[in-house]
Curated annotation (Swiss-Prot):
Stated name of the protein: Holliday junction branch migration complex subunit RuvA
InterPro entries in the cross-refs: DNA_helicase_Holl-junc_RuvA_I, Hlx-hairpin-Hlx_DNA-bd_motif, NA-bd_OB-fold, RuvA, RuvA_2-like, RuvA_C, RuvA_C_sf
Record has DNA repair as a keyword: yes
This protein's record includes keyword DNA damage: yes
Keywords, comma-separated and alphabetical: Cytoplasm, DNA damage, DNA recombination, DNA repair, DNA-binding
GO molecular function: ATP binding; four-way junction DNA binding; four-way junction helicase activity
Stretches the record annotates as Flexible linker: 144-155
Organism whose genome encodes this protein: Erwinia tasmaniensis (strain DSM 17950 / CFBP 7177 / CIP 109463 / NCPPB 4357 / Et1/99)
Domain III: region residues: 156-204
Pfam family membership, one: RuvA_N
Region: Domain II, residue numbers: 65-143
Subcellular location: Cytoplasm
Family: Belongs to the RuvA family.
């Protein structure tokens, strides 16, 4: 099982990053809340991973910290929540925001996440609340707002918007809904990551 990667970032196509470790390139899917914090292309990164094996694919999901990975692993234990939905949940909310929403039983906030209906939101509250009791409360102590740690190369407006829509679609939003979310941001000159971040913020 692949649990950790340390290597050079070759490509960043939200929500997927290509990282080269020991001469091998690994495609890793990451929640956008983690993706924002990655260094620039050609810089070194350390990613904690969860490896999923299916009949038709082998998938790597990556996180910037062990607590974030631990939360992901608890999420996919919930009935009806697979890796893709867990990724979407942690893209729409930071780990701390999700923990807070569950502890306060904020169903209305949870149903705004892609793929999460009322029944799934209620299930998340019931099952995850019990799971949190067995986890250290200080694991998700940071409640800092989303922030990019480095400047990204500017794409053209059309490229940035297209990539942002594609990323939101990959996270579970319908194409038309994703397009509306990006248009609603109202920042035609923004880069792809900024568009995604602002769109997800507005959705919650």
């Amino acid at each position: 099982m692949i649990g950790r990667l340390r290597g050079i970032i070759l490509e960043k196509q939200p929500p997927v990053v290509l990282i080269e470790a020991s001469g091998v390139g690994y495609e890793v899917q990451m929640p956008m809340t983690c993706f924002y914090e990655l260094p620039d292309i050609q810089h070194e990164a350390i990613i904690f991973t969860h490896f999923v094996v299916r009949e038709d694919a082998q998938l790597l999901f990556g996180f910037n910290s062990k607590p974030e990975r631990a939360l992901f692993r608890e999420l996919i234990k919930v009935n009806g929540v697979g890796p893709k939905l867990a990724l979407a949940i942690l893209s729409g909310m930071s780990a701390q925001q999700f923990v807070t929403a569950v502890e306060r039983e904020e169903i209305a906030a949870l149903v705004k996440l892609p793929g999460v209906g009322k029944k799934t939101a209620e299930r998340l509250v019931v099952e995850m609340k019990d799971r949190f009791k067995g986890m250290h409360g200080d694991l998700f102590a940071s409640d800092a707002p989303f922030a990019l740690t480095s400047e990204m190369p500017k794409e053209t407006a059309n490229d940035a918007e297209g990539e942002a829509v594609a990323a939101l679609t990959a996270l579970g939003y319908k194409p038309q809904e994703a397009s509306r979310m990006i248009v609603k941001v109202g920042k035609p000159d923004a880069d792809c990551e900024t568009l995604i971040r602002e769109a997800l913020r507005a959705a919650i």
